[in-house]
Structures are given as C-alpha cells and as structure tokens.
C-alpha cells in the first residue's frame, strides 16, 4: 500500500537528521536543510515548468514508473526519493521493495511510483540522480568496510563532496556502513599542514586553538594531522586533543 506522504516525510526527515545530527553545530534544522536542497534542485531542473510534459501530456493522465537497478549495489536514496516525490506532488504513491542499505542484484525492480504522469516526470530526473550517486557511494563504502573488517579501523567520510549535495553524500556513506566525520568547518577543529605552516609550529597551532576555544567557550572535538611519528610524539600529551590523524607521507606503514 502507498504511504501517507506527510507522515512519511516527517519520519524520513528524522532518519536523515540522525545521519548528521552529531555534526551540526548550533542546532541546525537538518530536516529543513534537506527540504531546501530538494526545493533548489527541483527549481534548477524544472524552473517555471516542464514545458515538454505540459505540452504533450494531459494533466489528468495517470500512470506508473517502475525502477530497476542496472548493477549489483547497496541501494541508497530510497528515503530521499520518497521525500522528493512528496514535495513534487503529495498525491504520488511510492512503493519500494527495499530499504536503504540493502543489497540489490542487477536488473531487480526496486519499486514503483504511481500518480500523475506530469508529476512523475518532474520528479524522475532528480530522484534518479540522487539515488544513482548515493547508491554508488554506499556500495563503494560498503566494499571498503568489508575489506577492513578484520582490523580495528573505520571508514570515515570527508568534506570533499559535491557542492550543495554534502548531506546526501554523507548520508550515503552512513548507509554503506561508514562513519560520518565533520560536516563542515564549524563543528570540529581539524589542524592540518596549512594551519601548522601559518602558525609557524605545530605546538603553536595547538596552543592558539586552545586559547580560541576557551575564549569562545566552545567544546568541540579537536583533531590534528601529523606527518610523522616525531610530530606525534611532540604533541601526544596535549589534553586538548581528542583524536590524532597520523599521515605518514612517502613512507610505507608495513
């Protein structure tokens, strides 16, 4: 049966919020963030109207779209797809046979959308773009998660994301079994080589960071990248630091 659109949207927004809630500094409304993304993406694609569909399809005409996967994958973006459909037309009914994070074999039907053909075609491209990209990220993430399973390590994401699509790409990493790192420049301190060079010294960078956080009464994670074990040993006893990233350049760990 079709899902109640308004009820589903609230639940889906909560699920999306769980992905990044620990990385949003200052109580950012994640649900509004996702809704805003959908609104802007739809306007980018539709503008003032889908002129081809408006010109060729009766607005009362209804139909059904069936979605298949072209490759084996970890499916991702189903919750987002339902939110997109709801925002385009609350009367669209969505029926999906899988949930985000499930493995799907090639050529499998994952679900259908029923309702106004004009509405289906307006939502189709954004829906497919998001699901294809998110599923690719989730699948690749899942591959590496299984690859490192014997070791006590985790796969983290980065800020190297598609502009204005970060929340969905990090969502996909989470779906694939990875761990979300900082969402932006505001929710964690990450002292890297550029900061160290500008400060003149790794200890100076850390001390300046400590002074700044105290002056602003900020309690957020502090991470520092070190390029060798010598740098690591110099700063390992700083209580301010919560995590170390050991980046060894041009050397083999094993």
Q: For each of these PLM feature ranges, what is it?
A:
Residues 237-254:
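Low-complexity basic/metal-binding stretches
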Residues 2-238:
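Acidic/glycine-rich phosphate/pyrophosphate-binding loops and surrounding catalytic core
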């Amino acid at each position: 049966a079709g899902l109640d659109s308004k009820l589903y949207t609230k639940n889906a927004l909560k699920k999306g919020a769980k992905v990044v809630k620990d990385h949003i500094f200052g109580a950012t409304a994640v649900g509004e963030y996702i809704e805003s993304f959908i609104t802007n993406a739809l306007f980018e694609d539709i503008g003032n109207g889908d002129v081809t569909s408006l010109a060729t399809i009766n607005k009362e005409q209804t139909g059904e779209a069936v979605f298949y996967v072209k490759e084996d994958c970890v499916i991702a973006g189903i919750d987002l797809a339902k939110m997109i459909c709801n925002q385009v037309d609350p009367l669209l009914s969505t029926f999906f046979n899988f949930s985000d994070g499930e493995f799907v074999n090639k050529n499998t039907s994952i679900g259908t959308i029923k309702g106004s053909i004009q509405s289906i075609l307006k939502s189709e491209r954004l829906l497919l773009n998001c699901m294809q990209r998110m599923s690719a990220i989730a699948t690749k993430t899942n591959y590496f998660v299984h690859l490192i399973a014997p070791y006590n390590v985790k796969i983290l994401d980065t800020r190297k994301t598609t502009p204005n699509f970060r929340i969905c790409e990090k969502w996909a990493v989470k779906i694939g079994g990875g761990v979300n790192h900082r969402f932006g420049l505001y929710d964690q301190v990450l002292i890297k080589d550029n900061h160290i060079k500008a400060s003149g010294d790794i200890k100076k960078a850390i001390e300046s960071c400590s002074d700044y956080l105290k002056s602003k009464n900020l309690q957020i994670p502090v991470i520092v990248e070190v390029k060798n074990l010598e740098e690591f040993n110099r700063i390992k006893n700083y209580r301010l630091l919560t995590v170390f990233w050991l980046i060894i350049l041009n050397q083999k760990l094993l």
